[in-house]
Amino acid sequence: MSLPFLTSAPGKVIIFGEHSAVYNKPAVAASVSALRTYLLISESSAPDTIELDFPDISFNHKWSINDFNAITEDQVNSQKLAKAQQATDGLSQELVSLLDPLLAQLSESFHYHAAFCFLYMFVCLCPHAKNIKFSLKSTLPIGAGLGSSASISVSLALAMAYLGGLIGSNDLEKLSENDKHIVNQWAFIGEKCIHGTPSGIDNAVATYGNALLFEKDSHNGTINTNNFKFLDDFPAIPMILTYTRIPRSTKDLVARVRVLVTEKFPEVMKPILDAMGECALQGLEIMTKLSKCKGTDDEAVETNNELYEQLLELIRINHGLLVSIGVSHPGLELIKNLSDDLRIGSTKLTGAGGGGCSLTLLRRDITQEQIDSFKKKLQDDFSYETFETDLGGTGCCLLSAKNLNKDLKIKSLVFQLFENKTTTKQQIDDLLLPGNTNLPWTS
């Protein structure tokens, strides 16, 4: 496989259905097109090594090829590896034990889980690759509930499946459905390495992009990934994503809601949860209609605008329902109130609540000056971090060595970008963002 090449995958937000999804109600998640992980796969400067460089978490580690030989060349261990390569529904504890010595030096939690995810997928997907450096850059805030770990897992899975010859070729022009299925399967394994029991939602959104509808199985309480309903032709919806930096415990928030549902007010909570599920169903229906309503005549434009206003109204309603069950936070309400005061659009919390992030779908009649004023006040007065992006958009994608080598100036800039430890989001977007540059990403 020719080097260097790049892979990328987006983050995600929950549009509708936070908390109600726990009680088997439908929910909708979507990719965040401009918040992404980028992975550069290049030749390592140190011979006979595999290197992982992830400056966002201050992590760089090299493993010797000899570290892997005990797994790949020993007859008994290679049989254990072969079993793990076939077991795409869960982690092989035999392989986990074989990887323990390679992780022994890593005590910091972030570093350990990043390395565990990396090594598990590496030995399963491209165990004979050598002299390779994996360099990660992300424009996603880590730990904000925006699917940063899934974005990383998908980027790694795509790169390693490509290196291992499981998908595509040097002349890869399009990722097939089977390619994406393989990537999603292994990214889910990567998520298991990091989180233990992930839902499968984050990696699916990061792989396929756009949006999906999901709900728990009422019989066993798990999310059946085979029942995901993907919205492929998703309308680009402009939004401001705001990260409050307010820490929160998803576990505590879910437990607090559970007390309301099962102990204190079950009859009150039932219609609220039902309404949240209905927001998800109607929201998906509206977005589907928006994606199909593309005419330029007066009637089509009017219909499109009416649908968009309905979507904004549903966002407002869903946030109100979340407030009613006690999962908002004064810091989130500041954003909601400011967006209402400035008539920017409709704001709701996204994710577990209690802090974290909000999304603001923007009205169509506002100016860039109004948007900038909104962002500036949030940043200057409250030290929040804002991201102007679109809801939905490209999922995982790959920039082959063939395409990267076509422009040596761009190639040089890419390497400079990854070597610079203090690269800004704007610098990354200007050079790499799919759809924002002329780079021929394959998706």
From Swiss-Prot:
Record: residues binding ATP: 12, 138, 143-149
Compartments where found: Cytoplasm, Cytosol
Leader peptide range in chain numbering: none
GO BP of this protein: ergosterol biosynthetic process; farnesyl diphosphate biosynthetic process, mevalonate pathway; isopentenyl diphosphate biosynthetic process, mevalonate pathway
Gene3D superfamilies registered for this protein in UniProt: 3.30.230.10, GHMP kinase, C-terminal domain
Residues annotated to bind Mg(2+): 149, 191
Entry keywords, A to Z: ATP-binding, Cytoplasm, Kinase, Lipid biosynthesis, Lipid metabolism, Magnesium, Metal-binding, Nucleotide-binding, Steroid biosynthesis, Steroid metabolism, Sterol biosynthesis, Sterol metabolism, Transferase
Enzyme nomenclature, EC number: 2.7.1.36
Main localization category: cytoplasm
GO molecular function terms noted in the UniProt entry: ATP binding; magnesium ion binding; mevalonate kinase activity
Pathway: Isoprenoid biosynthesis; isopentenyl diphosphate biosynthesis via mevalonate pathway; isopentenyl diphosphate from (R)-mevalonate: step 1/3
PROSITE patterns (UniProt xref): GHMP_KINASES_ATP
Cofactors: Mg(2+)
Keyword RNA-binding set for record: no
Means of activity regulation: Farnesyl pyrophosphate and geranyl pyrophosphate inhibit mevalonate kinase by binding competitively at the ATP-binding site.
Pfam families: GHMP_kinases_N
InterPro entries: GHMP_kinase_C_sf (IPR036554), GHMP_kinase_N_dom (IPR006204), GHMP_knse_ATP-bd_CS (IPR006203), Mev_gal_kin (IPR006205), Ribosomal_Su5_D2-typ_SF (IPR020568), Ribsml_uS5_D2-typ_fold_subgr (IPR014721)
Record GO cellular component, one term: cytoplasm
Cysteine-cysteine disulfides: none
Superkingdom of this protein's organism: Eukaryota
Active-site annotation: 202 (proton acceptor)
Function according to Swiss-Prot or TrEMBL: Mevalonate kinase; part of the second module of ergosterol biosynthesis pathway that includes the middle steps of the pathway. ERG12 converts mevalonate into 5-phosphomevalonate. The second module is carried out in the vacuole and involves the formation of farnesyl diphosphate, which is also an important intermediate in the biosynthesis of ubiquinone, dolichol, heme and prenylated proteins. Activity by the mevalonate kinase ERG12 first converts mevalonate into 5-phosphomevalonate. 5-phosphomevalonate is then further converted to 5-diphosphomevalonate by the phosphomevalonate kinase ERG8.
Additional facts recorded: Present with 3300 molecules/cell in log phase SD medium.
Family: Belongs to the GHMP kinase family. Mevalonate kinase subfamily.
Record text on subunit structure and interactions: Homodimer.
Protein's UniProt name: Mevalonate kinase
Organism, as annotated: Saccharomyces cerevisiae (strain ATCC 204508 / S288c)
Gene that this sequence comes from: ERG12
